[in-house]
Amino acid sequence: MDLAMGEKNMPKILINSVPKSGTNLLVQIIKGIPGIFQDQKVFYQSENYLKVLDIKPGELVSSHIPKNEEFSRQLKSHSIKQLFIYRDLRDIAVSLVYFINNKLHDHPLFPVFQKRILTFEEQLNTVICGIELIGDEKNNKYGIERYPGVFHEYLPIYKWKDDPTICSMRFEDLVCNENSKDIEILKIIDFLWEDLGYLKMDKYHLLNMMKQNINPEKSWTYRKGLIGNWRNEFTADNKNKFKEVTGEFLIKYGYEKNNDW
């Protein structure tokens, strides 16, 4: 069987994610499928979201698209399979502080962290709570005058989790151990195909091919990819600020049973 790019039986795949939730890990896993290709890397700007609908069989794109019922219906009508990955927002907040300081220098908070908010604790509170930008900080490429905080910025993306038309997964389940990783990847395979016959392999052979394509060192955004590293970084004040801003968010998304963490 010729598995040339665009083979008509191949799925059209959108990887949608909360930023800093293992987007590139999931991309590597999916690119381990024979015949999957990625011509255009990302569709992160809002004006590009509808271009996702034009992807071809076998094509993979990734983005950070907020939940939208009409877009969900359009994906279904275009036979596009959405894989959605999310992560503990506390680990995302910590990761984002490091990412802004070390690599993402066009982020609106980079000049804030360079000149105004200097300690890690204060920077983490800024990512959690948001901040009004002042002076030259307003001259950012996004044209914003206030950074809203990671909760308010990303909550509309998290809301995809309960969409019944997609395959939703937690970053933690892809990395915590081999058994849970296998369960998640097999879930992806079952979501993408009803019948693997034309690939001339069974799902466990495909599972191993997908796992063998994982290489964190190839990811520009990769730092540690740890689970629960927030415990080493959050101060008591960070915890209080997070609870004030997010309410019962962690409980709803299965990361805590109550707010006594």
Predicted regions and their residues:
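A short acidic, often aromatic-flanked loop/helix-cap motif at beta-alpha or helix-coil junctions
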Residues: 68-70, 174-177
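PAPS-dependent sulfotransferases, especially Golgi type II membrane carbohydrate sulfotransferases
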Residues: 2-13, 79, 138-147, 151-162, ...
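PAPS-dependent sulfotransferase catalytic domain
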Residues: 1-169, 245, 253-258
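Short histidine-centered beta-strand/loop micro-motifs
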Residues: 74, 178-179
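Generic recognition of short, well-ordered alpha-helical segments
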Residues: 25-28, 179-183
